[in-house]
Structures are given as C-alpha cells and as structure tokens.
C-alpha cells in the first residue's frame, strides 16, 4: 500500500507556498501524515569562504533572524495547516541541499512544494531550488506551478490521474506499477499518455498519412508490450507534439487531478530527472508527482 506517513513541506513563506498549503493539509489528512514544515534561512553564497557562515554571521544577527523566522513560520502554520500534525524545522544554508538532506534524515515519503516562490529566481519558469530538489530527491516530489489557480479536491479525492510514459521498459515499468497501485488504492481512473517525439502538432495534416500511421502504430505496439510486461491494461492516449504541451492539453480535457511522471536514472547531466520532465512540471494545469 502506498502511504506517506511523513511529508516534507519546505516553505519560503511566499504566497506560492501559502497557496500550496491546502493541498498539503488535504493530503496529510487523507494519509494521516506528520508534516515537517521546513524553512531554510538562506546564507548568501558570496559570504561563504574559509570561515563558512561566520562571515555572514558577522554582518547579520543570526539568532535574531532565526527567531524572527520562527515566529513567521508559526503564524504560517496556524493560518494554513489547521489541526494537521506539524513539526516546524528551521535551518540555514543552501535550501536545495538542506531539503534533500532533511528528506533523507527523516525518511519522508513525499516532498511537497510549489515550483517557485518570491525569490531572486521569480522571473524563471521554474525556480532553481525546485529544479535541484527534483534532480536530487530520493523520494517522490509533489509540485504545482500555479497552486492558487488549482482546485483542491474535497478530502483530496483523486478522480482522474494521468501517467506520462516514454515506452522505455527499464524506466516506465516501475513508474506504471506505482501509478497503477496509487490509482487503484484511491479508486481513481488512470490513463497513460505518450507524446510522439520529433513531430509538431501540425505535421500530420491528413488523418490517413502513412507516416503518421506507422509512427503511431509503433508507439502503440511498444506501449502494449510495456503494459504486458508491467501487468497492466490501462487506456492510452498517443498524440504528436511536444511532451509538455501534449500532457497539459490532455490533462485539461480529462479534468485531471494529478499527473504522475518518472525520474529514471539516465547517464546525462540531468541525473535522475529525465528529459521532458521539466516541461511537464512547468506546464501542467494540475499538481505533478515525480517518482
């Protein structure tokens, strides 16, 4: 059974984090989870040197700053998480590294965070902290790009779930197992989605184009074989286009509550986060769980 006895909710006290809090509260209530509410006092990289944080501490009263943030964190908790079991935690240093470390130390089952807050990276489509956490985290990571615009399902009931696959057995079979088990336990409808790479949406102008038929048939055959190996028999949507766009449009049409994607081990600079995952996380109209 998939469960999340411990959830890590890193917050920078921004409006994005405040908008994500109802999802954390609903999911923690559903799974009876303990929530670690983590705030990292970020030490500017320019102050790191031979003396570490000492240089920064010489200019900033660190205990006073931490105490001020502790009060802000307590107010954030009271305003957003209600009766959920919460353990506040304040640390200083590099946010992404600390989030990954705390997740390992506390053996959390899920990290929940918006894709960016109000920081120096607010102009980017995805904040650097979220990108690093997606890259390094060993547990599933829940993200939402615009949580304020999303509807929290009542009692966190998932009705429609999409699972984006690439039809690569080594990476997708574990992903299929996780998504199928989660959907079954939550009594949700699960649909697979696969984007045909290398083609734009307008490239197939004729529905009977032989190239279109060939490419789509190959994709469907690979997915059928994948499902046979995984022991699943799920409905599949195969469409041409950019992966992020295909997943987004289908999620809108299906009124999806959740998108599940994988972060398979690949020999590329992206490490655990496979290609196209950034686009899905960035563009999805609903929360995304990266496993």
Task: Annotate each predicted stretch with a short phrase.
Residues 1-19, 47, 110-115, 132-177, ...:
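Intrinsically disordered or low-complexity boundary/linker segments at protein termini
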Residues 1-2, 42, 71, 75-111, ...:
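Structural beta-alpha unit
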Residues 6, 32-36, 85, 159-160, ...:
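Residues at the starts of beta-strands that form the adenosine-phosphate
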Residues 21-28, 175-183:
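Histidine-anchored nucleotide/phosphate-binding helix
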Residues 36-38, 87-91, 142, 191-193, ...:
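General small-molecule cofactor/ligand-binding pocket signal
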Residues 39-71, 193-221:
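Acidic, proline/glycine-rich short linear motifs
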Residues 48-49, 124, 153-154, 173-174, ...:
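Short, well-ordered secondary-structure micro-motifs
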Residues 110-135, 258-283:
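Glycine-rich, Arg-bearing micro-motifs that act as flexible, cationic patches
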């Amino acid at each position: 059974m998939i469960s999340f006895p411990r959830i890590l909710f890193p917050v920078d006290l921004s409006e994005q984090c405040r908008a994500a809090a109802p999802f954390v509260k609903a999911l923690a209530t559903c799974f009876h989870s303990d929530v670690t509410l983590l705030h990292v006092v970020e030490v500017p990289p320019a102050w790191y040197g031979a003396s570490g944080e000492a240089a920064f501490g010489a200019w900033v009263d660190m205990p006073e700053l931490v105490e001020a943030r502790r009060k802000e964190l307590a107010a954030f908790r009271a305003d957003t998480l209600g009766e959920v079991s919460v353990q506040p935690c304040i640390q200083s240093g590099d946010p992404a590294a600390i989030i990954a470390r705390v997740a390992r130390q506390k053996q959390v089952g899920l990290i929940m965070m918006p894709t960016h807050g109000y920081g120096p990276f607010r102009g980017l489509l995805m904040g650097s902290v979220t990108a690093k956490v997606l890259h390094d985290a060993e547990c599933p990571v829940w993200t939402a790009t615009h949580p304020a615009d999303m509807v929290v399902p009542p009692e966190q009931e998932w009705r429609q779930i999409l699972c984006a696959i690439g039809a690569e057995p080594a990476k997708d079979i574990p992903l299929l197992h996780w998504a199928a088990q989660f959907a079954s336990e939550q009594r949700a409808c699960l649909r697979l989605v696969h984007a045909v790479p290398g083609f734009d949406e307008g490239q197939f102008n004729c529905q009977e184009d032989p190239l279109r038929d060939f490419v789509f048939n190959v994709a469907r055959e690979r997915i059928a074989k994948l499902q046979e190996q995984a022991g699943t028999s799920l409905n599949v949507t195969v469409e041409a286009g950019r992966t992020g766009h295909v997943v987004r449009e289908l999620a809108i049409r299906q009124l999806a509550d959740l998108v599940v994607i994988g972060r398979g081990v690949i020999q590329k600079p992206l490490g655990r986060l496979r290609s196209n995952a950034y686009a899905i996380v960035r563009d999805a109209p609903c929360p995304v769980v990266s496993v």
